[in-house]
Amino acid sequence: MRPYVVIAMAALAGLIARAPAPRADSIFGINLLGERIESVDARVAALGGFVQIVDESLGLLQFNPAMLAFSKRVAFGAAGYVTSDANQSAELERTTVATKFSTLMFAFPLFRRTLTASVGYRGHYDPDFDYSIPGTTTSGEEYNDIFERSGGTWGVPITVAADLGRYAKVGGTISLERGTIENRWLTDFTGSNTVDATSTQIREVSATGFGAGVVVRPIAGVGIGLAFESELDYDVDVTESFTNTAADTSYDETMVQPARWIASAAWRAARGFTVYGGASFSDFTKFEGLAFPTDRLTEEWVAALGLEYRFRGSRFPVRLSGRYEKLPYTLPDGEEITRVSFALGSGLLFRTGRGKLDAALQFGKIGSVDTNTYEDRQVRFYISITGSEQWSTKRETRY
């Protein structure tokens, strides 16, 4: 799932054209390229987010479609997160960010215990964001450049997975991506003898994405997964309006987003103790569209490590993880942008054995005001519920 790149590009294009200090861009609020495929499932998030081989989630809320093969009967999943960012900068007067993302999935058997299908909904991703940059004209008039963004994108993924036996599962996904993103600019003069200037840009986006995945278990207690997300070709309809209505216009654009690979592994190190690892790669130098400066694009790398422990089969597991990301764009002077985040969480297996509730809290940071003139701190809360008629109170011991 990768529609969020459209939001990032639209916002960044406006900043590059207007803001005198691009170093002060909100990494979390504007540059959403590095966050577009993160799983919403709270258990997966608590284990690093990119560890797409967590068996109890049954593939419902993950991005490796092969995990769906573990669901043999009717199953469902619902999840979401909310986040708030605190931004500090040497140039920006105000920056606020609020996002939310929800996911629904419903799975059902297609053919005996071999084929399983699911249909779902991902969105509405709603990155409400605004910032303000103060300034003074050559004639001494004070003003604030204010940028606001709202709207979001959504997708409908359809997945089919096959169980090829004890050692391998495979799956494929097609996803219909749609969305609307609105950007608004306002030059607000504080004086009484000036006229404020406004402009609005609305982007309607659409694309179709494909994905595939495989999960193997070469030895007892070990699972390895590989997932692929295809290149996305977006069609973008743009409408722009200005204070001077004679300048209003509309036009069409295209955008190409590069493919991505995700590798994951799980190892049951001891009874009740499991180690998860994951990594992803995408070459964003192949990105095309929206007049984004190609000299600021780079490769994206993500690495995550997660631990889960259940004390004597407790229904309340302890989960924690760390993640390192090299985001797929650089600052104007060529400096690479990295993000470090940590997460912790737990869950509850219902006594009926047919459902579970999970929650996670993630903390992230980019930069430092002292060394980079900007700093972003993020707190994100996840919650999810999944259930299946096939589950029992006895805990799964596949890993």
Question: What name fits each language-model region?
Answer:
Residues 22-45, 107-399:
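Outer-membrane beta-barrel porins/channels
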